[in-house]
């Protein structure tokens, strides 16, 4: 997996890539580190209702999920990944892009149709209306 800048597996995929059963934050950290050691620069493991965990080789960033009234989880991972990629492409820091992606995905699961994606203004409102705190662990 040399030359991969970002990979965004879910818990199951991270387990397959790393050989580590991912079931909590600590096992996600071990899996992210193992994937990084295979040459991936940035690993972002999506953890469903537990949020996401990123590792860039120097620090881990745990971004909790935003509270949501879940109607349909179909497309939640795609919504998260699209918002993350958009934020990174716009030059946002990984921390900022993760926050935006988490808020975006929380709004996406509140619709009954997986193709209904939230508007930017709704995402910003969600971010501003909730005390959101990421946890950063140094390696």
Language-model region placement:
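Conserved phosphate-binding/catalytic region of the ribokinase-like
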Residues: 25-139
């Amino acid at each position: 997996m040399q030359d991969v800048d970002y990979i965004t597996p879910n818990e199951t995929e991270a387990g397959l890539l790393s050989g580590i059963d991912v079931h909590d934050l600590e096992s996600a950290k071990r899996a992210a580190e193992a994937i990084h050691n295979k040459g991936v620069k940035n690993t972002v493991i999506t953890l469903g209702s537990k949020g996401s965990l990123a590792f860039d080789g120097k620090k881990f960033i745990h971004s909790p999920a935003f509270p949501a009234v879940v109607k349909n989880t179909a497309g939640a991972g795609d919504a998260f990944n699209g918002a993350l990629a958009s934020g990174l492409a716009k030059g946002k820091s990984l921390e900022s892009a993760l926050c935006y992606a988490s808020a975006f995905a929380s709004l996406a699961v509140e619709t009954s149709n997986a193709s209904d994606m939230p508007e930017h203004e709704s995402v910003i409102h969600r971010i501003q209306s909730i005390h959101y705190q990421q946890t950063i662990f140094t390696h």
